[in-house]
């Protein structure tokens, strides 16, 4: 078999698709859509999101965003509500921190919305536990 003498494979030749510096047009919520903040990552393309109407909903990351747009806890997202299931929705868009601040300044998001903070809704069942070990007792 031939030896690998190159400097990488076909992924290196393709190059990275860097479009971070492009400004995109701000998308506002329409009928049947709601702004939400991610409270928990559930895995398998699902999230728990606290909508700004006070309801916690289960969100499904749609295929267009999956593995392309990384969604983290505390991010502001646009959730499309399902007509037949009120407690579930689909993630349409993830807002950057700058876009979320713009939405907050324009009054689209409530003033209580915390932007770019990971611990958004307090520790649910997570307490700071300190353990002390006695080496002499062992």
Curated annotation (Swiss-Prot):
It comes from Schizosaccharomyces pombe (strain 972 / ATCC 24843) (Fission yeast). Signal peptide: none annotated. Residues 1-15 have a biased composition (Basic residues). Residues 1-28 are annotated as: Disordered. CDD domains: S1_IF1A. Seems to be required for maximal rate of protein biosynthesis. Enhances ribosome dissociation into subunits and stabilizes the binding of the initiator Met-tRNA(I) to 40 S ribosomal subunits. One of its GO terms (cellular component) is cytoplasm. GO terms for molecular function: double-stranded RNA binding; RNA strand annealing activity; translation initiation factor activity. One of its GO terms (biological process) is cytoplasmic translational initiation. Residues 22-96 form the S1-like domain. Residues 16-27 have a biased composition (Basic and acidic residues). This is Eukaryotic translation initiation factor 1A. Belongs to the eIF-1A family. Keywords: Initiation factor, Protein biosynthesis.
């Amino acid at each position: 078999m031939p030896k690998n003498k190159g400097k990488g494979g076909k992924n290196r030749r393709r190059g990275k698709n860097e479009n971070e510096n492009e400004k995109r047009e701000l998308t506002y919520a329409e009928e049947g859509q709601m702004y939400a903040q991610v409270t928990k990552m559930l895995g398998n393309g699902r999230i728990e999101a606290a909508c700004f109407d006070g309801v916690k909903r289960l969100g499904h990351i749609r295929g267009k965003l999956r593995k392309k747009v990384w969604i983290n806890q505390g991010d502001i997202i646009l959730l499309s509500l399902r007509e037949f299931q009120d407690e579930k929705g689909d993630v349409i868009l993830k807002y950057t921190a700058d876009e979320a601040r713009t939405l907050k300044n324009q009054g689209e998001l409530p003033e209580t919305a915390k932007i770019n903070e990971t611990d958004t809704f307090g520790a649910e069942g997570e307490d700071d536990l300190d353990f002390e070990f006695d080496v002499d007792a062992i």
